[in-house]
Each structure stands twice: as structure tokens, then as C-alpha cells.
């Protein structure tokens, strides 16, 4: 009887571990930041410190600007001002 209870406990623990592994996201390419909406108006160039583009795995393309105060703001990559800021940041990097 003790053997059956011990075997059942081991089986339950193994099942719990397996379910956690399979429910976790696969791969290291899981996007960490995606844009679901964009800023409504142009940011002041003076407050923008850096940028990065969202992953291609995100549902919408986006550019995330990092402000000098550490805030992250999503912008539409097709807008002219966004492309100008990216060019300026690249040239001054």
C-alpha cells in the first residue's frame, strides 16, 4: 500500500512538472514589448533618448521611443516624424 501511494505521489509530481514546461513560451524569441496602440501626436524630439523596433512576432509593427525620463512610448513606424527621429538617433549614436 505504501509503495502504491509513493508511486502515485511521484507520478503526480512528474505530471505537474511536465504541464509547467509545456505551458511555458517556446524559444528565446518571445517578444518582450509590443505596441497595441500608437501615440496620438508627435513627441518632442528633445525628450527622446533612444528607440527600438518591436518584434516581427507582434500583431502590429511599432517603434518604441525611450524618453530621457525612462518612459516608453509606442509610435507608428509609417509616420514621417518617426522615421526622421530614427534617422537622427542613428546618426547621433
Swiss-Prot record:
The keyword Signal applies. Pfam families: IL8. Keywords: Chemotaxis, Cytokine, Disulfide bond, Inflammatory response, Secreted, Signal. One of its GO terms (cellular component) is cytosol. It is found in: Secreted. Its main location: secreted. The keyword Iron does not apply. Disulfide bonds join 34-58, 35-74. GO terms for molecular function: CCR chemokine receptor binding; chemoattractant activity; chemokine activity; kinase activity; phospholipase activator activity; protein kinase activity. Residues 1-24 form the signal peptide. Gene3D superfamilies: 2.40.50.40. GO terms for biological process: antimicrobial humoral immune response mediated by antimicrobial peptide; astrocyte cell migration; calcium ion transport; calcium-mediated signaling; cell activation; cell chemotaxis; cell-cell signaling; chemokine-mediated signaling pathway. InterPro entries: Chemokine_b/g/d, Chemokine_CC_CS, Chemokine_IL8-like_dom, Interleukin_8-like_sf. Belongs to the intercrine beta (chemokine CC) family. Self-associates. Also heterodimer of MIP-1-alpha(4-69) and MIP-1-beta(3-69). Interacts with CCR1. Monokine with inflammatory and chemokinetic properties. Binds to CCR1, CCR4 and CCR5. One of the major HIV-suppressive factors produced by CD8+ T-cells. Recombinant MIP-1-alpha induces a dose-dependent inhibition of different strains of HIV-1, HIV-2, and simian immunodeficiency virus (SIV). This is C-C motif chemokine 3.
Amino acid at each position: 500500500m505504501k509503495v502504491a501511494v509513493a508511486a502515485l505521489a511521484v507520478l503526480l509530481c512528474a505530471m505537474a512538472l511536465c504541464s509547467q514546461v509545456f505551458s511555458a513560451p517556446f524559444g528565446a524569441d518571445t517578444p518582450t514589448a509590443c505596441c497595441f496602440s500608437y501615440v496620438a501626436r508627435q513627441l518632442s524630439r528633445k525628450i527622446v533618448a533612444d528607440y527600438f523596433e518591436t518584434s516581427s512576432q507582434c500583431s502590429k509593427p511599432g517603434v518604441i521611443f525611450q524618453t530621457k525620463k525612462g518612459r516608453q512610448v509606442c509610435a507608428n513606424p509609417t509616420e514621417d516624424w518617426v522615421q526622421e527621429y530614427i534617422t537622427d538617433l542613428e546618426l547621433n549614436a
